[in-house]
């Protein structure tokens, strides 16, 4: 009997697929483990260089002045990200909030934001003012900031000629590394570099801004090391390692990070304020563990992609592809299959496993969404989770996985509930 069936009731045909997938995935698992080892040693070196001590994890209250623990964590982030400086704060509520702070920090009335990799994902549309519902709520457009975009080509690659044409009129060039709700691969670092080089050749003063959500530690470099001026991400995704309870980060050029700090706090205050309360230990520990946790999440993705491919689905990316974020997307085919897949992920989660996800409205999204997230941290996507909008072709987005053993069990149960019903 498979060890899996000691704990969950899987059908023989599902276990047969599992056995084949595990064999096919081994070379790709080993590749990710090599990336993990490189990034973990880079992380260790950054901690040592900063001379972080146990007292740096104690936290501060009130204004948070002279918080050496906060300063050292930001120094570690900057070194690991290949950046001059970083802003790492628990006051960032989500990836969208962190992106909004950064964009408002960089842009002024009359400036133009160029989305060089097509329309950003749904929640950022509201920040910009593209969804038509937020007029008067303080969007970028409300403040006289213009928006332009270079749509992706039919094959989901950047349109470099269009970027060259549009970059001279823009102050910020926005690159979204992950796919959002598109069935494309995440952009690799070579593509990010080419977009950055193309925009900068047309406008040497343009600021290259990368939404790095879901992409940290999937490769041995980060976007600042290939031409980005600023990168932004969330601590309840990759860099929090499943341990950081909240927060986000902005890293890059020192002058730009300072502008973002003025927006988060107040002009004249910048990075000097922001108490850390009881969060430093979890933020330090989560970041330290992040390379290993991201490896487990990518191994989960590789395994899920292989299983889905054996079922005749067409996941993006494929298990044998290079991985540049932790997300897998595939067309579930029907609403029932999408809901069943999410319910299977939820049933094999450590938290709220008894819940059965159902479609419901979600702030920032135009369609009802079904979402599974049995996570220790609410909304965490480095923990195994999946979601999808209730619209044809019922595309499902799977991400995360703190450890492969448990995530494998969840993927199997999801596939069984979606495609092997009695």
Feature map (PLM): residue ranges:
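Extended, compositionally biased flexible segments
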Residues: 71, 77-82, 90-91
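Short glycine-rich or small-residue beta-strand-to-loop segments that form or flank ligand, phosphate
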Residues: 60-61, 87-90, 326-331
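Conserved PLP-enzyme active-site core in the AAT-like
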Residues: 3-26, 33, 43-56, 65, ...
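Conserved C-terminal alpha-helix-loop-beta "cap" of PLP-dependent enzymes
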Residues: 309-422
């Amino acid at each position: 009997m498979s060890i899996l069936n000691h704990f969950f009731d899987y059908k023989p045909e599902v276990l047969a697929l599992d056995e084949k997938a595990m064999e096919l995935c081994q070379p790709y698992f080993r590749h990710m483990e090599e990336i993990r080892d490189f990034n973990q040693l880079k992380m260790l070196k950054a901690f040592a260089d900063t001379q972080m001590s146990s007292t740096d994890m104690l936290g501060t209250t009130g204004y948070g002045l002279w918080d050496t623990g906060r300063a050292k964590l930001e120094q570690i982030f900057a070194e690991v990200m290949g950046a001059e400086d970083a802003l790492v704060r628990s006051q960032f509520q989500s990836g969208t909030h962190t992106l909004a702070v950064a964009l408002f920090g960089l842009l002024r009335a009359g400036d133009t934001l160029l989305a060089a990799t097509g329309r950003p994902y749904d929640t950022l549309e509201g920040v910009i003012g593209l969804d038509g519902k937020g007029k008067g709520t303080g969007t970028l457009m409300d403040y006289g900031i213009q928006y332009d975009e270079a749509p992706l080509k039919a094959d989901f690659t950047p349109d470099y000629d269009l970027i060259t044409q549009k970059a001279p009129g823009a102050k910020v060039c926005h690159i979204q590394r992950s796919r959002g709700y598109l069935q494309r691969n995440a952009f690799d670092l070579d593509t990010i570099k080419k977009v950055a080089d193309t925009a900068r050749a047309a406008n040497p003063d343009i600021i290259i801004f990368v939404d790095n959500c879901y992409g940290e530690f999937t490769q041995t470099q980060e976007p600042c090391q290939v031409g980005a001026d600023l990168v932004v991400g969330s601590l309840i995704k990759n860099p929090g390692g499943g341990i950081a309870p909240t927060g986000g980060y902005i890293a890059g050029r020192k002058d730009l990070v300072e502008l973002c700090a003025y927006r988060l706090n107040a002009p004249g205050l910048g990075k000097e304020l922001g108490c850390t309360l009881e969060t430093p230990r979890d933020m330090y520990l989560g970041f330290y563990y992040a390379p290993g946790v991201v490896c487990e999440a990518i191994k989960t993705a590789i395994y899920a992609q292989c299983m889905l491919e054996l079922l005749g689905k067409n996941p993006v990316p494929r298990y044998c592809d290079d991985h540049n974020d932790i997300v897998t997307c595939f067309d579930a085919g029907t609403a029932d299959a999408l809901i069943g897949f999410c319910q299977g992920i939820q049933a094999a989660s450590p938290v709220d496993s008894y819940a059965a996800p159902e479609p419901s409205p979600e702030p920032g999204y135009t369609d009802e969404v079904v979402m599974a997230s049995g996570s220790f941290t609410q909304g965490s996507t480095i923990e195994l989770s999946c979601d999808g909008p209730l619209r044809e072709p019922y595309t499902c987005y799977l991400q995360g996985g703190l450890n492969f053993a448990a995530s494998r069990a969840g993927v199997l149960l999801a596939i069984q509930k979606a495609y092997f019903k009695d």
